[in-house]
């Protein structure tokens, strides 16, 4: 399994709404389909680190690339949902962004989810159900008993921790991210979305 790659951009192009990079790593060039946010932030011959997912297909293999570990793990969660393929998953991440997408799934905001190309009402409902189930499992593992309230202030950090751990981050990484956000003066009464945004940004910088 190829978890991440670091190299130089040898080529970059678009085919319709699909974004592609050719990443030169030593004597090997890897062709990746990438999220739009990653593609727009690259330039030819620039050094780039890409978090990757290798997909097995009937006609071969396909590498998908992402700017952050969180985006990559979110992509894996999305494609595990019935009816959501790689293109729909990329469209959700590129169109909404990780934080807004997580917020929409947690809040069961079907209208927002349906803004992404290829996502209808039934798919949006399945996405919300799958994410809530995954998040509830993490929440219960941490001793939570009350319903999750992702749109509420972060007076209790267990909900935030459950969200970050569901994206694949370990307990120590999560603790460091939450502590860092607090040390930067983020108000405990700020909505969950703001804390999540700060934590994901910090975790992304550490991975880079």
From Swiss-Prot:
Region (Flexible linker) residue spans: 147-157
Q: Which InterPro entries match?
A: DNA_helicase_Holl-junc_RuvA_I, NA-bd_OB-fold, RuvA, RuvA_2-like, RuvA_C, RuvA_C_sf
Keywords from the UniProt entry: Cytoplasm, DNA damage, DNA recombination, DNA repair, DNA-binding
Region annotated Domain III sits at 157-208
Location of this chain's protein in the cell: Cytoplasm
Instruction: Please list the GO biological process terms of this entry.
Output: DNA recombination; DNA repair
State the Gene Ontology terms under molecular function.
Answer: ATP binding; four-way junction DNA binding; four-way junction helicase activity
Cellular component GO terms held in the UniProt record: cytoplasm; Holliday junction helicase complex; Holliday junction resolvase complex
Q: Where is this region: Domain I?
A: 1-67
- Show the segment(s) annotated as Domain II: 68-146
Its primary localisation, in coarse terms, equals: cytoplasm
Domain writeup:
Has three domains with a flexible linker between the domains II and III and assumes an 'L' shape. Domain III is highly mobile and contacts RuvB.
Its job: The RuvA-RuvB-RuvC complex processes Holliday junction (HJ) DNA during genetic recombination and DNA repair, while the RuvA-RuvB complex plays an important role in the rescue of blocked DNA replication forks via replication fork reversal (RFR). RuvA specifically binds to HJ cruciform DNA, conferring on it an open structure. The RuvB hexamer acts as an ATP-dependent pump, pulling dsDNA into and through the RuvAB complex. HJ branch migration allows RuvC to scan DNA until it finds its consensus sequence, where it cleaves and resolves the cruciform DNA.
Family statement drawn from the similarity comment of this UniProt entry: Belongs to the RuvA family.
Q: What is this protein called?
A: Holliday junction branch migration complex subunit RuvA
Gene designation per UniProt:
ruvA
């Amino acid at each position: 399994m190829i978890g991440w790659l670091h190299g130089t951009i040898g080529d970059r192009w678009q085919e319709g709404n699909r974004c592609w990079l050719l990443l030169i790593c030593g004597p090997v060039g890897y062709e990746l389909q990438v999220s739009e946010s990653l593609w727009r932030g690259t330039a030819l011959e620039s050094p780039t680190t890409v978090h990757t997912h290798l997909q097995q297909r009937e006609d071969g293999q396909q590498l998908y690339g992402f700017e952050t570990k969180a985006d990559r793990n979110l992509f894996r969660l999305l494609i595990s949902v019935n009816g959501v393929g790689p293109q729909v998953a990329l469209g959700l991440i590129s169109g909404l962004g990780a934080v807004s997408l997580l917020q929409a799934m947690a809040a069961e905001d079907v209208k927002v989810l349906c803004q992404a190309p290829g996502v209808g009402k039934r798919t949006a409902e399945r996405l919300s159900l799958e994410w809530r189930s995954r998040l509830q499992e993490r929440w219960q593992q941490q001793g939570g008993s009350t319903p999750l309230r992702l749109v509420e202030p972060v007076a209790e950090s267990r909900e935030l921790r459950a969200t970050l751990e569901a994206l694949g981050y370990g307990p120590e990484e999560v603790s460091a991210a939450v502590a860092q956000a607090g040390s930067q003066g983020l108000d405990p009464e700020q909505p969950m979305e703001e804390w999540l945004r700060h934590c994901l940004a910090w975790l992304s910088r550490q991975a880079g």
